[in-house]
Amino acid sequence: MADDEGEEDPGINNMGNLLQVISSESEEEDEMELEDAKTADSESPNIINFDTSLPTSHAYLGVDMEEFHGRTLHDDDSCQQIPVLPHVQVMLIPGQTLPLHLSRPQEVSMVRGLIQRDRTFAVLAYSDGLQREAHFGTTAEIYAYREEHEFGIETVKVKAIGRQRFQVLETRTQADGIQVARVQILPERVLPCPMTSLQLDSQSRHLLFPTNKPVSGRSPQSKCQWLHKYRRRKFLGASLTSWPSWLYALYDADSLMERVKLQLHEWDENLRDDSLPANPIDFSYRVAACLPIDDALRIQLLQIGNAIQRLRCELDIMSKCTSLCCKHCPDTEITTKNEIFSLSLCGPMAAYVNPHGYVHETLTVYKAFNLSLVGRPSTENSWFPGFAWTIAQCRVCGSHMGWKFTAVRKDLSPQKFWGLTRSALQPRIPEPDEGEMGHDHSPILCL
């Protein structure tokens, strides 16, 4: 990712400008500003008047992009030959939007050919930057396209969306240099409700689920009350088995979705339930795309073949994760889960691309710690219109962590926030008690 490759070219860590050299006085001012951010008023803004639809539109790519309609879906378990974009180092989740800015002649030629066919390419999932072979991936379908010619250089800007998971069978390189993968499309296994075989006609009237589901914005207490009533009615047949009803609820999609939503509201109190997918499969993928976890955990979520197990793993991650630390120095805490909030319709984290073609999955948080700022604020190619960005680095190891965004207008809320790149973060769980700490204890989450 860009945080590793940025050491070779400092210009690729920003959103468009070359890294600006500033005086030591400016650096001291930035340090003072950061200290103020840690000790200032800790209250988060109650009202966000920023248009959250702007980041999802990716307007920085241009407004006159050619849009395509329809979608391409391959049959489950079918084998397909799909071209691969080799330099896209993003672990794409189905349903996740992927913006691209391609300038290599081979990639430009490949995208042109895709536009004439099914507009589908493969994004391989690498668990780390040193892995040479990928075993899983996701198909991506282009839904918006723009071609540019400037100074004799041809570039294409693309908006794509993840569609289906696949397992890589083999890869080969064609005579024109384009890599093609032979993949098997992985199906989504829909598990039946365990109560289906226990439903008796005489009890059918008791199986009507409560319809007064709490709307978005209601208190957690009302949601818990609804969930309790839902479980009591849906798992009425559990009395005929040797297993308690709460055990069936652990594998019920609707119950898991409500529990995940409660966790999401702890991460983002402004989240609206009606903005989330109602389908368990789509919902599980939306949550997976928003979790600030490393690639090792994300690829495990990508391998799971049913929504229920995926939701259970996501719930485990969210309940254990309390803070995020620097990936290169894990003892350095960067932010906590209470600081996460959504400034986009996609949720607290989404993928964005800079003019150099590097894709950053950026997590928005109110406050961050142990960071130093480099350069001066700039609004050029800002992913959040109305905000100026400043490069942020880890104060301990100096690795690129993301950006600080400051509002250019006083009437814009929030006035400032941080955008942290997922590739530089590592989730961490609290240290256990001294008596429970074993020799192999690690604060890093694992499934």
Curated annotation (Swiss-Prot):
Keywords: Cytoplasm, Metal-binding, Nucleus, Ubl conjugation pathway, Zinc. GO terms for cellular component: Cul4A-RING E3 ubiquitin ligase complex; cytoplasm; nucleus. Residues 82-322 form the Lon N-terminal domain. One of its GO terms (molecular function) is metal ion binding. It holds the Pfam family Yippee-Mis18. Residues 1-47 are annotated as: Disordered. Its main location: cytoplasm. Substrate recognition component of a DCX (DDB1-CUL4-X-box) E3 protein ligase complex that mediates the ubiquitination and subsequent proteasomal degradation of target proteins, such as MEIS2. Normal degradation of key regulatory proteins is required for normal limb outgrowth and expression of the fibroblast growth factor FGF8. Maintains presynaptic glutamate release and consequently cognitive functions, such as memory and learning, by negatively regulating large-conductance calcium-activated potassium (BK) channels in excitatory neurons. Belongs to the CRBN family. Component of a DCX (DDB1-CUL4-X-box) protein ligase complex. This is Protein cereblon. The lineage of its organism: Eukaryota, Metazoa, Chordata, Craniata, Vertebrata.
